[in-house]
Amino acid sequence: EKYYYNNVIGTVNLLRAMLAHGVKKIVFSSTCATYGEPQYTPIDEQHPQNPINPYGRTKLMIEQIFADYERAYGLQHIALRYFNAAGCSADGKIGESHTPETHLIPLVLKAISGERKDIKVFGTDYDTPDGTCIRDYIHVEDLALAHRLAVEKLGSYNGCINLGTGIGTSVKEIITAAEEVSGKKCPT
């Protein structure tokens, strides 16, 4: 329910307020979750969308609402479809902070540092080279830059842009990289 209320109803309320004040431009943080299970990789913007959870469905609904508002009210919009945001800025001012933590990289680092007992690897039978799930990670500073560039493009482009690297990294590869950087073994 929270995704429907926050994402869909919240966006409609925001759009109503924007139109009431003559604002017709928006950059939206969408998600690769609008695609659901990939039919092919790398995933491009024309990939069929079939979200498999409420989060992805509500983000897709918002993209569809933007298209309707473009036709009805001239809304200029860019939806940035994030893949997996990761990392932080060198000064630590921009980055991930989740309570409770659910993202792989921070969980691995917490296990290595001893802040948590271990890291559980769920799924070792994927059709991937090492059997673990593969994700496309994008650094938070790259996301920030993409937002700035999208704001500059508003008016000359309406639509969606994927934000990823196009390079997948497996769960085991993340664990190995963290071990190499830290010089410590990750308890699994």
Give, region by region, the residue ranges found by the protein language model.
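C-terminal substrate-binding subdomain of Rossmann-fold SDR/epimerase-dehydratase oxidoreductases
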Residues: L107-T188
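Ser/Thr-centric signal marking residues that sit
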Residues: T11, T31, T58, T132, ...
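Hydrophobic pocket-lining residues that define ligand/cofactor binding sites across diverse proteins
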Residues: M18, E70, A150-L154
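Structural signature of the Rossmann-like NAD(P)-dependent dehydrogenase/reductase core
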Residues: I26-F28, T34, I78-R81, K120, ...
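Glycine-centered small-residue hotspots that permit tight backbone geometry or close packing
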Residues: S29, G56, G95, G123, ...
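A conserved catalytic-core signature of glycosyltransferases
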Residues: S29, P38, C133
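Catalytic helix-loop patch of NAD(P)-dependent Rossmann-fold dehydrogenases
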Residues: K2-N13, A20, K24-K25, T34-A79, ...
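Active-site proximal helix/loop that lines the substrate pocket
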Residues: T31-T34, G87-A90, Y126, E152, ...
